[in-house]
């Protein structure tokens, strides 16, 4: 979405960026994931000779854009309050079971500005509770809509998530903030987010404001941050936002940039921005497997075949990886994909004089033959969900 206003920017690797300022990369935010996991094998009566092991294991999930169009939040309004509890109910068991769940919130939450759902995105603060209830732990705010309600909106959005017990990355409220590091079952996981641009609104900022609060794809700074993350953490995850919207395959710029991130030290790259899913790639570096998904698509939005004539915009994926740390070395040991589909059902309520809808993110595997929810939807809907499952997996083409 959006246009770009040219100002005092430089071009770096094809992206508009501000002149580089000294980047704060020393601050480490560390917290403990909520789930408990046995981290050490001990001798048992049945196996008295079991040697001790220092292996630590963590499961991490990540998903695509949470995009609250006006009809999405408008449909959740009953005249007095907003209720988003249905949005993620079906994916909650999967997301909440992860040791670390990463979400991508695209837009702002700023009660001092009007609600908006395109081309400016400003959602009600009530969306946070449904995101938290689904089991998400951290939210990526590095995207082209984070300045939609100004620097004030950026700060309010970040602080609102933090106030509700969720961490954020990809922006800074305070210039002294550094790399987010989550300690997950004894494994230190660094998480970084970068955006290709900010819809031209960045032209209204001073250089100081820009450098104090935003992470763009200035590759010199990206390299510096990834290398620093590798020094202070066991495992590095990067969520870049770039690419061509609604294209099912990455641009050469995405390929080059994400490969460079792996070369600099990223272990996993979870891409976003195109609003559709794009393929995956497994890279072997120094004998270890690294993983890229070029785009995770949308998790929740009003984009779909009925609104855009593009069926891929209603399809998403929850990536599910396992990492292990043993003898001081942390590796990626498994990668799974869980395709999703956005259900939109008309409800007995109006929005701006038109229909309103109940939105739910369905976990497509539940509707496959033999799945627990196979017989809970009509035939046409079932075919749409099953096609999403099959075609998403085919496009992702995971080879790990």
Language-model features, listed with the residues they occupy:
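Acidic, metal/ion-coordinating pockets
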Residues: 12-32, 36-400
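Hydrophobic membrane-insertion alpha-helices, especially the h-region
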Residues: 2-14
């Amino acid at each position: 979405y959006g246009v770009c206003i040219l100002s005092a920017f430089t071009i770096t690797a094809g992206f508009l960026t501000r002149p580089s300022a000294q980047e704060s990369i020393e601050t480490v935010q560390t917290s403990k994931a909520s789930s408990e996991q046995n981290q050490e094998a001990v001798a048992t009566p049945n196996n008295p000779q079991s040697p001790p092991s220092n292996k630590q294991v963590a499961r991490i999930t990540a998903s695509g854009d949470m995009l609250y169009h006006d009809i999405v939040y408008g449909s959740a309004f009953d005249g007095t309050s907003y209720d988003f509890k249905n949005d993620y109910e079906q994916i909650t068991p999967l997301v909440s079971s992860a040791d670390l769940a990463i979400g991508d919130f695209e837009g702002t939450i700023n009660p001092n500005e009007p609600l908006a759902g395109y081309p400016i995105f400003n959602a009600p603060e009530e969306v946070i509770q449904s995101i938290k209830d689904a089991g998400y732990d951290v939210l990526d705010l590095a995207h082209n809509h984070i300045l939609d309600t100004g620097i004030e909106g950026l700060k309010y959005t970040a602080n609102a998530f933090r106030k509700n017990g969720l961490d954020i990355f990809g922006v800074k409220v305070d210039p002294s903030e550094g790399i987010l590091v989550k300690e997950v079952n004894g494994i230190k996981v660094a998480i970084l987010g970068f955006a290709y641009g900010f819809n031209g609104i960045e032209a209204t900022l001073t250089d100081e404001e820009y450098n104090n609060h935003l992470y763009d794809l200035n590759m010199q700074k990206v390299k510096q941050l990834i290398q620093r993350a590798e020094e202070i953490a066991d495992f590095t995850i990067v969520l870049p936002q770039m690419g061509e919207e609604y294209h099912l395959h990455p641009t050469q710029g995405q390929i080059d940039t994400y490969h460079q991130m792996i070369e600099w030290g990223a272990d996993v790259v979870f891409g976003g921005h195109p609003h559709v899913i794009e393929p995956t790639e497994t890279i072997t570096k120094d004998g270890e497997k690294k993983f890229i998904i070029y785009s995770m698509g949308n998790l929740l939005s009003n984009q779909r075949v009925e609104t855009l004539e593009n069926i891929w915009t209603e399809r998403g994926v929850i990536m599910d990886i396992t990492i292990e740390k043993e003898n001081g070395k942390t590796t990626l040991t498994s990668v799974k994909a869980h395709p999703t589909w956005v259900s939109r059902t008309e409800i007995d309520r109006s929005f701006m004089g038109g229909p309103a809808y109940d939105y739910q993110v369905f976990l497509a595997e539940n509707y496959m033959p033999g799945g627990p929810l196979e017989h809970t939807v009509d035939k046409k809907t079932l075919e749409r969900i099953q096609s999403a499952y099959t075609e998403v997996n085919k496009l992702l083409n995971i080879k790990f």
